Structures are given as C-alpha cells and as structure tokens.
Amino acid sequence: MLAQGATIGSNLDKGNRMKIAVLGGGHGAYAAAADLAEAGHEVRLWRRDAAALQHVTSAGGITLKDARGTREVPIGCASADLGVVVGGARLIVIPSPATAQDDIARALAPHLADAQVVFLAPGTFGGYAMATFAQAQGSRADVLWAETGTLPYLARKHGPREVNVTVRAVRLPTGVYPARRGGDALAVIGEAYPAVQACGDILSGALMNAGPIIHPPLMVMNAAPLQHFDKWDIHTEGTTPAVRAVTDRLDRERIAVREALGYGAPHFPL
C-alpha cells in the first residue's frame, strides 16, 4: 500500500549510473529490478530459488508493464549467487517481506563491504534488526542501513518474469541507521529513488509503515465476504465507512506513538 502519495508515471532518469543489487523474488523485487534498470542503472537481481530465476536469466530481462505500455527491460545479471550480485554494489535494495529478513541477513552478512547502503522498502524495523544480525554473524563492514514504510511500487507479477506496475510512490520518508550518517545514505538512495526524504532515525522510518494499520482491519472486518465470494476487493468493496473509521483510529495511535517517542511532523496520516 502506497500511503505516502503515488503516481502512475515512470522512474526514468538517465543520470548517474550506479551498481544496484536487488534482493528478492516477489512483486516488489521484480518491479525494482526492471524500473531501476530502465532508469539506466547497472542492476543485478538475486533470488534464492535458482529454478524460478532461470526464466529471467534465459530471457535476459523482465517484461515491464505500466502506464507507458509493455516492453522488455534487460537485466545485467540475475543470479542465485548472492556474492556475485552484491559484490561491488553501491546500493542494495531489499523489497522483501519481514519474514525473509533473517534469512537474507544471514546470507548477506559475509558479502557486505564498506560504503554500501542497504535500503529496505519496506523495512518494518528490519533495517536495525538486519544490521544487528549481520554484526552478530561477524560482519564488520561499515554499512549504512535505511528503510521506508512502503514498497516504492504498487506492483503485481503476471508471470515468471513479467511484472505490472500500476503506481509509483512520490514520497518515501526514510530513516537511517546510524542516524548521524543519514545524509550520506539518502544521497545514494536518492540517485535511485528521487522520492526519498529524510525522516530521522530508522525507528522513525519504521513508524511510517502503513501496512499494519491498513491491512488488519481490512482482513478481519471483511472475513465473511472473503470466505463467501469467489472475488472480493478489500480495497474498494471492502473499505466501508466502518472499516475506514477503524483504520483512522489505528493511524491516530501510530501517530501518538511517534509523538510519544519525540518524533515530529510530518507523520503522513492516511
């Protein structure tokens, strides 16, 4: 869910070319790999399922669909070898669910290098968790960790190497660990995602995540129609005034937590 504003446009920017590693095999990872490659960056895609990744490696790219149409986007490297993918990367983008973060951190730790920036989108406080996990695994690399509260895209895979991007975020409030290096991290991330903006430390970034606010009421309060109908869109049919009222109440609690911890506006209410 793109809670921080959205656009149907493109992330096209043929400016500074950067080596970017994208980790994951889901909707967001394929969207990021295609979008960033089309923007002119040298993108390397990793997922642990080598057989599933073979569709991309065999074709040499990803089919990207968005408001501009459908086209093939070449991906410089797609590999199940994490060392190959992250070696030399300036930016490591992880658009994966929180449930995958421990496994990714364990695999990633031996390959991290000084001056790399790891960007979790979304993070759900995984930036700090992965940083401490990597350190516990013995990594001493001087890495900057950053996270925002949402995927940069509303995206859906339509096949083993095809992704449809219907929306792109226009604001990505991002927190950094360690916070004193926030400017350095955001300068790197901003070359890939111009929509990033500073929101303080990494906990502040985690508290921008609208997912825990939006999705539980939608699922719980739509349990009956979800079980009854073959198709039921929780975001349109399921977002009734009563559901929205609960969502708004939860979001006020999120903002109250931010304020209690000393974080100032903007809180980006839903």
Language-model segments: which ranges?
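N-terminal amphipathic/basic-hydrophobic helices that include classical n-h-c signal peptides
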Residues: 1-17, 97
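NAD(P)+-binding Rossmann beta1-loop-alpha1 motif at the extreme N-terminus of oxidoreductases
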Residues: 13-66
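A short helix-to-beta-strand connector/capping loop
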Residues: 68-77, 139-144
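Rossmann-like NAD(P)(H) cofactor-binding subdomain of soluble oxidoreductases
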Residues: 98-161
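Substrate/ligand-engaging "lid" and interaction regions
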Residues: 152-250
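Small-residue-rich helix-loop
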Residues: 251-270
